[in-house]
Swiss-Prot record:
InterPro entries: DUF167, YggU-like_sf. This is UPF0235 protein Sfri_2863. It holds the Pfam family DUF167. Belongs to the UPF0235 family. One of its GO terms (cellular component) is cytoplasm. Signal peptide: none annotated. SUPFAM superfamilies: YggU-like (SSF69786).
């Protein structure tokens, strides 16, 4: 298994992320690997969907896309999520460093 399989650059230009979210962190950041997922720490609390909305906003800003282009495919109620970012204008350096050279 490819050790960076948690991030896939889709053929249509979308980015699919397998993410572990840490809500109520001291600061927002892409932490790195967490098992076979990308760990992202966010300051928002996991109450009433605030963490999901904040995560979408954070990733949209990082990838320079509209919030409507960030979709939580799986994991709305948990910390383990699949997120699709449609046509990212920028891939954050923390994510680009983990991308497999075969998926670009």
């Amino acid at each position: 298994m490819n050790p960076v399989s948690y991030i896939n650059d889709e053929q249509q230009g979308d980015l699919l992320l397998f993410v572990y979210v840490q809500p109520k962190a001291s600061r927002d950041q892409i932490v790195g690997l967490y098992g076979n997922e990308l760990k992202i720490a966010i300051t928002a609390p996991p109450i009433d969907g605030k963490a999901n909305a904040y995560l979408s906003k954070y990733l949209a800003k990082a990838c320079k896309v509209a919030k409507s282009q960030v979709h939580i495919i799986k994991g709305e109620q948990g910390r383990h999520k699949q997120i699709r970012i449609s046509q990212p204008q920028v891939i954050p350096p923390e994510i680009a460093a983990l991308l497999s050279p075969f998926s670009l």
